């Protein structure tokens, strides 16, 4: 991740919203450069670390929270659960998300695992921890990213604009108090193969999110993926 000012790396709305933690973002950049210089490296690539914040803050209407990036080199691309279009096969958690997408919406299975069209629709795909050491899941937890992403979530809530949060798994569920009573939430177990059969399948998160958005007076999301 480059040492450029935050305003050059993210959407202007997000640059303002993350102003209180700009110094923390700088510290995280220093941490990542140390990871590289030590030979440990990090994922996703530097240009994609803040990718979730390059889409307009003002447009966000659904928040989907992930834990941390995929640790497999070539998979993480800066949006939670998403992978680059050329990744085959898709990670199993994403495959389960696609199974539920098909069941819930009656749409065909997407051709690839790139969820960028959702981001362009105002769906924020945010990992609580924005980086990971290759091959080492959760290796950057507690290093400081949580300060940044919790500031982001508070900024979303403070807008007083329609917002629905989709919380998959225990880690995401701990954010519910931060969202407050005004943000409707859709909760289930994580789509991981270890838990998906215990309540993720059949939870209909996509159609339910649209029902809640309409109830808030907002436009529903067009969830279709190519």
UniProtKB/Swiss-Prot annotation:
Its main location: cytoplasm. It comes from the Bacteria. CDD domains: UDG-F1-like. PROSITE patterns: U_DNA_GLYCOSYLASE. Its EC number is 3.2.2.27. It is found in: Cytoplasm. GO terms for cellular component: cytoplasm. SUPFAM superfamilies: Uracil-DNA glycosylase-like (SSF52141). The keyword Lipid metabolism does not apply. GO terms for biological process: base-excision repair, AP site formation via deaminated base removal. SMART domains: UDG (SM00986), UreE_C (SM00987). It is an enzyme of class 3 (hydrolase). Keywords: Cytoplasm, DNA damage, DNA repair, Hydrolase. The active site is at residue 68. It catalyses: Hydrolyzes single-stranded DNA or mismatched double-stranded DNA and polynucleotides, releasing free uracil. The keyword DNA damage applies. NCBIfam families: PRK05254.1-1, PRK05254.1-5, ung. Belongs to the uracil-DNA glycosylase (UDG) superfamily. UNG family. PANTHER family: URACIL-DNA GLYCOSYLASE (PTHR11264:SF0). Excises uracil residues from the DNA which can arise as a result of misincorporation of dUMP residues by DNA polymerase or due to deamination of cytosine. This is Uracil-DNA glycosylase. It comes from Mycobacteroides abscessus (strain ATCC 19977 / DSM 44196 / CCUG 20993 / CIP 104536 / JCM 13569 / NCTC 13031 / TMC 1543 / L948) (Mycobacterium abscessus). The gene is ung.
């Amino acid at each position: 991740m480059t040492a450029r000012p935050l305003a050059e790396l993210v959407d202007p709305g997000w640059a303002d919203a993350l102003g209180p933690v700009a110094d923390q973002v700088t510290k995280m950049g220093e941490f990542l450069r140390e990871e590289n210089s030590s030979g440990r490296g990090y994922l996703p690539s530097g240009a994609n670390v803040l990718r979730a914040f390059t889409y307009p803050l003002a447009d966000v209407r659904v928040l989907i929270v992930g834990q941390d990036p995929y640790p497999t080199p070539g998979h993480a691309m800066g949006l939670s659960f998403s992978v680059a279009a050329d990744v085959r096969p898709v990670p199993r958690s994403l495959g389960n998300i696609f199974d539920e997408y098909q069941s819930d919406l009656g749409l065909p299975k997407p051709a690839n695992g790139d969820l960028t069209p959702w981001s362009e629709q105002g769906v924020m795909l945010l990992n609580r921890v924005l980086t990971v050491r290759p091959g080492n899941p959760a290796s950057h937890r507690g290093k400081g990213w949580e300060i940044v992403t919790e500031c982001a979530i508070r900024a979303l809530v403070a807008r007083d604009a329609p917002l629905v949060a989709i919380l998959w798994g225990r880690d995401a569920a701990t954010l519910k108090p931060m969202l407050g009573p005004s943000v409707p939430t859709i909760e289930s177990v994580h789509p991981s193969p270890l838990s998906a059969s215990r309540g993720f399948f059949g939870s209909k998160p996509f159609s339910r999110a649209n029902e809640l958005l309409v109830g808030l007076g907002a436009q529903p999301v067009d969830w279709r993926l190519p």
